[in-house]
Amino acid sequence: MSFAANAKKELTQLELVSCCARAELSALIRMNGSLSLGNKQVGLDVTTENAAIARRIYTLIKHLYPNIHIELLVQKKMRLKKNNVYMVRISKEARQLLEDLRILNGSFQFIRDISPEIVKESCCKRAYLRGAFLAGGSINHPETSSYHLEIFSLYEEHNQAICELMNGFSLSAKTLERKKGFITYLKESEKITEFLNIIGAHQALLYFEDVRIMKDMRNSVNRLVNCETANLNKTVGAALRQVENIRFIDKTIGLENLPPKLQEVAKLRVKHQDVTLKELGEMMQGGKVSKSGINHRLRKIDEFADKLRNGTFDAKKLNTHRGK
């Protein structure tokens, strides 16, 4: 079962008071319901591929409208994924329910946004967002490369109302038009965990945070290892270059023609190719030399090698340095 499916399953098991049940059911029916007209009656079908959500819708309707007759149907998809489709059907008397949930008004007109009366209390705002997430929400698994939570709605007015409802909780949600509708989405991991807390998905929140923390730790360790590897490669590369230059000088003019201080560090570098500059400095016979001092001497050796290669080496200048 996916992370999103687990989160939704958790939400369907929450207990509700009547006002919150009404707000949640309003979102579920508005987003997953379809109307039918016949024999002067209004019928309602609410469909979902999630059995737990279908049971939730059935339970909410029974809780709020015990006198309305409900059917729970199961159909098999014959194309593509072949999942079961669960349908909660009200063949008659749906108009009363739709008006009470502020989906239709008294003139039998569809209300495209969210009625303030449905989300009057803070708990009802949370419940409506819970219903909207159950009906049209999706969330990436926290292990994936990017964090993303979204709620899909067919109507721009309703999508904007969902965004405003979310931003009432300081979530910094944004909207985007898609090919077949609109979405309200979150990209920041902290905002996603806040949203999960708001709608009551606390187990999903804890799992999300655990995975996110481990993921951040792995990324930090990888960055540290990469940095240390890069530094090590740089150090090894410099040591190999220094040894190559020292051997080139020894082959062309001989190390004995270098100033004594450079001779000593050159011989130590060839003998101890894998040690650090600090360790080289501690090996000097004339007394400990600082890391910067060793680095300066090795740079001078590199300069001598470069001049020998390009023909600009001046033996007279070398003789003036030999006693140094």
Swiss-Prot record:
DNA-binding region(s) in UniProt: 276-310
Gene3D superfamilies given in the database record: Homing endonucleases
InterPro entries on file: Homing_endonucl, Sporu_reg_WhiA_N_dom, Sporulation_regulator_WhiA, Sporulation_regulator_WhiA_C, WhiA_LAGLIDADG_dom
Residue ranges of the TM segments: none
Entry keywords, A to Z: Cell cycle, Cell division, DNA-binding
Annotated S-S bridges: none
Keyword Secreted: no
Alphabetical GO biological process terms: cell division; regulation of sporulation
Family annotation (Pfam families): HTH_WhiA, LAGLIDADG_WhiA, WhiA_N
PANTHER family on file: CELL DIVISION PROTEIN WHIA-RELATED
Function, as annotated: Involved in cell division and chromosome segregation.
Family statement: Belongs to the WhiA family.
Protein name: Probable cell division protein WhiA
Organism in which the protein naturally occurs: Shouchella clausii (strain KSM-K16) (Alkalihalobacillus clausii)
Organism lineage: Bacteria, Bacillati, Bacillota, Bacilli, Bacillales
